[in-house]
Amino acid sequence: MTELLKTPIHPLYAKYGAKTIDFGGWDLPVQFAGIKAEHEAVRTDAGLFDVSHMGEILVKGPDSTSYLQYLLSNDIEKIKIGKAQYNIMCYETGGTVDDLVVYKKSETEYILVVNAANTDKDFEWMVKNIRGDVSVTNVSSEYGQLALQGPNAEKILSKLTDVDLSSISFFGFVEDADVAGVKTIISRSGYTGEDGFEIYMPSADAGKVFEAILAEGVAPIGLGARDTLRLEAVLALYGQELSKDITPLEAGLNFAVKLKKEADFIGKEALIKQKEAGLNRKLVGIELIERGIPRHDYPVFLNEEQIGVVTSGTQSPTLGINIGLALIDTAYTELGQEVEVGIRNKKVKAKIVPTPFYKRAK
């Protein structure tokens, strides 16, 4: 059996009461104090996540922008230095290699932050499709990454840095930011639906920053709450809402797919055809009317006929209802449409509802 990968924070997990699980080959905390308490901490105060398992890929060289325009679905030319952009990397079929965030450090240097389990696959795909004068380097082992999320994130982080955090706009970032004596990159971004920051630092210093933030009274948060938080906010998870068989259009990520950009990106032709023909299926929110929790891969029925499948589901800690996302036949995606979810050997009533399930007050 292959030994599980560990983040630089791993030696500290036991000290804070982490229960760990195998997550895509990594030994990561599923919870500390408990999923509901952790979820609530992020929604009402702040919580700290170890996300050092995420991959970082460095793209450098004079042709970096045109290469990324070819590789990715969003319009890379629109990114200003010091800003980030959400992106999809597609196969020629329009299916998804990965979803990721691109950070523009200079006109000739970008960092791509990718899903942990996809890092090697993404890197190989990027090298295979290299164009022009660019270098592509997997620098994942060099970085630790923490996410401080919640309405009080700015107030807490400002105690540990001289950077004026209020000047960092959403998806903006600053480099060489001192946090607890460590040189970091601070980005105003996250995966929870709350305000917050993602902080990148040398791997060797990650534990120091982690403990400095926790010392401000912040709760450590595990993967369980990370999933319930992102699901309430309807943020896609690769392997569930996106995959090689699910296109970004089907997943409702049109905002990150610029079919009108001049550059021909990989998958563009297939996505244009899919859009012109009309989507056969799309991602919708569902709320259960009867008791039961929808889970990944549970079938969705209408009048005994299967019309789709659940991609993610949970009991919403914030709303106190059972919610899910489902990829279903476009003909049955009207709001209020009643459907049934196959839970074990029973069909449970549900209805299609607006998303996101949760949106923070600005």
Swiss-Prot record:
- Top EC group: transferase
| Entry-linked Gene3D superfamilies | Aminomethyltransferase beta-barrel domains (3.30.70.1400), Aminomethyltransferase fragment (4.10.1250.10), Probable tRNA modification gtpase trme, domain 1 (3.30.1360.120)
Give the top-rank taxon of the lineage listed in the UniProt record for this protein. Bacteria
Among its keywords, does the record have Transferase?
A: yes
Belongs to which family?
A: Belongs to the GcvT family.
Assembly information from the UniProt record: The glycine cleavage system is composed of four proteins: P, T, L and H.
Q: What is this protein called?
A: Aminomethyltransferase
Lineage of the species this protein comes from:
Bacteria, Bacillati, Bacillota, Bacilli, Bacillales
